[in-house]
């Protein structure tokens, strides 16, 4: 048992996992599909953060990275019982913005409950469905979205990482 886990047990604290979701990242879409099951299966406290694209030199050819990530997600999704259609293009900015505003308005539990549905509608390019989900779950203003993403980016940077679709637990990163 690692030192951090020993401290957690001694203090009778739950396992705490932090999840970093980059809305238009294909891997975040795959992760979104397992979050609810993951949090239900294990006795964990799950904190969810919205983040922006990798900062600085962490993704020097960002468009190429996203093209390859879409292809990779398409190729592996079915093998894990997940879904990801063959997307040659990134989602349109208007559907990204709606999805992000919905997710930014959620607390952790609501985020876990709705992220897969919101992500599916966004990757399907279904603006009408996203607007219905916005009415159902609520949405944040663009200023609130910026603040939520800034908090997520700050936490991710504090933990010394740069990517989305990442889980952080007991001092270690998992993808």
Where are these regions (language model features)?
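A short, charged/proline- and glycine-enriched loop
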Residues: 10-17
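Structural alpha/beta surface segment adjacent to cysteine/selenocysteine redox centers
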Residues: 23, 29-122
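C-terminal cap of thioredoxin/glutaredoxin-like
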Residues: 31-38, 115-175
């Amino acid at each position: 048992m690692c030192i951090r886990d020993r401290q957690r047990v001694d203090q009778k604290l739950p396992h705490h996992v932090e999840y970093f979701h980059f809305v238009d990242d294909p891997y975040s879409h795959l992760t979104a599909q397992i979050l609810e099951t993951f949090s239900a299966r294990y006795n964990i406290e799950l904190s969810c953060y919205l983040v922006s694209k990798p900062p600085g030199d962490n993704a020097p050819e960002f468009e190429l990275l996203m093209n390859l990530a879409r292809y990779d997600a398409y190729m592996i999704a079915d093998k894990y019982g997940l879904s990801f259609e063959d997307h040659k293009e990134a989602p349109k900015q208007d559907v990204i913005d709606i999805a992000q505003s919905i997710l930014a308005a959620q607390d952790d539990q609501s985020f876990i409950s709705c992220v897969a549905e919101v992500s599916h509608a966004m990757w399907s390019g279904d603006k009408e469905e996203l607007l219905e989900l916005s009415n159902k779950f609520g949405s944040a203003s663009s200023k609130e979205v910026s603040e939520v993403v800034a908090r997520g980016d700050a936490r991710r940077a504090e933990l010394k990482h740069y990517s989305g679709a990442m889980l952080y637990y007991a001092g270690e990163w998992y993808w």
